[in-house]
Amino acid sequence: MAEEQDLSEVELSPVGSEEPRCLSPGSAPSLGPDGGGGGGGGSGLRASPGPGELGKVKKEQQDGEADDDKFPVCIREAVSQVLSGYDWTLVPMPVRVNGASKSKPHVKRPMNAFMVWAQAARRKLADQYPHLHNAELSKTLGKLWRLLNESDKRPFIEEAERLRMQHKKDHPDYKYQPRRRKNGKAAQGESECPGGEAEQGGAAAIQAHYKSAHLDHRHPGEGSPMSDGNPEHPSGQSHGPPTPPTTPKTELQSGKADPKRDGRSMGEGGKPHIDFGNVDIGEISHEVMSNMETFDVAELDQYLPPNGHPGHVGSYSAAGYGLGSALAVASGHSAWISKPPGVALPTVSPPGVDAKAQVKTETAGPQGPSHYSDQPSTSQIAYTSLSLPHYGSAFPSISRPQFDYSDHQPSGPYYGHSGQTSGLYSAFSYMGPSQRPLYTAISDPSPSGPQSHSPTHWEQPVYTTLSRP
């Protein structure tokens, strides 16, 4: 019990009070009788080594008491002479910072019963079996402690209680302050992206119909139908998840980058006006087009201008939410257009002989039959935007009242529905795949040269200039 008391006092004594006693000038063996704490500290306390010089001093002290025959006498005397001539008060003490008090040395907690047992047993075992690894020794000591019964533990418990009372006397204002664990987890308070980011033209405020479409405006004009009035591809989409473009641009020919149409103005009610003029239709992924059945007409009608003149509607609403024919080509099926019930579909069967189908699209607007932006008829294919109310698809066509639809329409039937019963917008439908071949070769009725019927080999198409109303 006396040995345990000595050990515990050494463990409890603060570093400041321990060092001058251990490092007093003189030979190392003279440190032993200098109090119980010093003797205990010198007898092999391996658990708390100091910095380099202090460790040497403790080692010398340990050698002086325990194994005198390890070093010759001349070596021990030389070491003692060197150590006695050095002022050890100049050596900075190892101070563990406790809170903000950097000047005061760290006060250790009083040992509990297991610590009393483990320290005494560790010293005894380390002297007897120096080859034992410290970690294995600790494990074994813990196992042995759990196997002890209450009568075996009682002396250690009493000693721990005595140490606790002594610690309370020595440090009356002591308060246990455990070191705060550094929180390695990343801060989770990262702010979510705002609903309509202007840089991406996002429309997350428009709820699940758009599935928070983040359409990149940082690549404008790459085959864009509305950026500089070149509707090379039918205009963009109405919604889609923020996936990167996966469809290869097979129909892209010569899109000029013209970032003068930046649709970054937020609409009223927190719903941004998405300018899809800078969105290439060929970049829409397959999942977007296969999930287009959940389509709310009332959400989209707010973007239409009040007048039904398709010259304006084609330039605005077709740019706002258009579904082009290349969209269904990329999708591969026509299941993404759902037919709303109770809407009359004026089906215009193509008149004409030997594959010259001229589909005439009529508009019952308040101004009468609307006049699309006419332009001089040339031998190349020109395009205007036939504005559908829901999908606003800018179908490539000849810009005349009689529209010759070119030969790259997809096989799926198109249903363009009038969302309002007043019939402000044009409504038309194509024949199903059972009524017409996959690609109908349509030639321009005007005198023209030979045209190629592949959309990747158009020769210098003539474009209608589309402008905002």
From Swiss-Prot:
Residues of the region (Transactivation domain (TAM)) are 231-313
As for membrane topology, the entry says:
Peripheral membrane protein
| Keyword Protein biosynthesis listed | no
What is the annotated role of this protein in its UniProt record? Answer: Transcription factor that plays a central role in developing and mature glia. Specifically activates expression of myelin genes, during oligodendrocyte (OL) maturation, such as DUSP15 and MYRF, thereby playing a central role in oligodendrocyte maturation and CNS myelination. Once induced, MYRF cooperates with SOX10 to implement the myelination program. Transcriptional activator of MITF, acting synergistically with PAX3. Transcriptional activator of MBP, via binding to the gene promoter.
Q: Where is the composition biased (Polar residues)?
A: 443-469
Q: What protein am I looking at?
A: Transcription factor SOX-10
| One GO BP annotation of this record | central nervous system myelination
Q: Is the keyword DNA-binding assigned to this protein? A: yes
The UniProt annotation puts the region (Disordered) at: 1-70, 163-203, 215-278, 357-378, 436-469
Q: Which gene holds the coding sequence for this protein?
A: SOX10
Give the span(s) annotated as Dimerization (DIM). 65-105
Q: How does it assemble?
A: Monomer. Interacts with ARMCX3 at the mitochondrial outer membrane surface. Interacts with PAX3.
Matches recorded under CDD domains: HMG-box_SoxE (cd22031)
The annotated regions of Gly residues compositional bias extend over 33-44
Q: Any idea where this protein resides?
A: Cytoplasm; Nucleus; Mitochondrion outer membrane
Q: Where is this region: Transactivation domain (TAC)?
A: 356-469
Q: Give the primary localization class.
A: cytoplasm
